[in-house]
């Protein structure tokens, strides 16, 4: 009898343990599902914020989508892990969010900017940094660094602070080169769209305005190696009018 009770007690303990394991597994699935939902909502919120900036500059079309895809691709080419690539895919499209604070008279002016107007335009990186710095989340922190530094140049000729070399965060350097590539490939009222080959020639060899010295050397090398994928991304998310 005692032996039977012992067996029943052991079976009861085993069933309890299995029930606890099943409950824990169910909780983990629920938490995982919740986390996926939060991440999806977070990504959509970031996309909405980026789109809000682009409404100030409607010529850009699919630009914000391409920038994220380019940046993630380039991060992968540089050996970044999956999490880092996903972070910059979400963060890089926010690079121009500071334009929401730029007056339309300056931002949408069709002719060349005056010195005073260009000085106003050059404030948008700092405006973007102020907007994005309200959050301490890693993606937002990265986005704030990108917004502030994506117009800096490796040789120190950029703005707003004239940083050079390793003073510039690598995520900003990645965004810089993909932003230049996309601008070269895109049609604008003041210029035609360039082919992939033409854009690569300007980035790698320079054209007077753009120089290889503007770009972080390891980022430039990785970009050259990943250029076919960059071309594919552009073709996949091409502006409707092109």
Feature locations, PLM:
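Metal-dependent catalytic cores of enzymes that make or break cyclic nucleotides
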Residues: 15, 33-37, 43, 50-242
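Amphipathic alpha-helical coiled-coil "transmission" helices that mediate dimerization
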Residues: 2-47, 58
């Amino acid at each position: 009898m005692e032996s039977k009770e012992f067996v029943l007690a052991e079976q009861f303990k085993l069933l309890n343990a299995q029930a606890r394991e099943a409950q824990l597994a169910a909780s983990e699935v629920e938490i995982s599902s919740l986390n996926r939902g939060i991440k999806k909502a977070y990504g959509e919120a970031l996309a909405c914020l980026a789109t809000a900036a682009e409404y100030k500059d409607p010529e850009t079309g699919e630009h914000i989508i391409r920038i994220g895809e380019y940046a993630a691709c380039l991060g992968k080419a540089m050996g970044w892990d999956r999490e880092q690539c996903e972070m910059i895919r979400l963060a890089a499209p926010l690079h121009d969010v500071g334009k929401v604070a730029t007056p339309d008279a300056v931002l949408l002016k069709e002719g060349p900017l005056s010195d005073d107007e260009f000085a106003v335009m050059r404030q948008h990186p700092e405006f973007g940094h102020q907007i994005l710095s309200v959050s301490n989340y890693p993606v937002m922190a990265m986005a704030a660094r990108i917004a502030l530094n994506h117009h800096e140049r490796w040789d120190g000729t950029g703005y707003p602070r004239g940083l050079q070399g390793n003073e510039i965060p690598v995520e900003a350097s990645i965004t810089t080169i993909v932003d230049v590539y996309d601008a070269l490939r895109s049609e604008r009222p003041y210029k035609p769209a360039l082919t992939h080959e033409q854009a690569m020639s300007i980035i790698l060899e320079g054209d007077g305005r753009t120089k290889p010295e503007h770009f972080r050397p390891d980022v430039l090398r990785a970009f050259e190696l990943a250029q076919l994928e960059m071309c594919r991304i552009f073709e996949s998310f091409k502006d409707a009018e092109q």
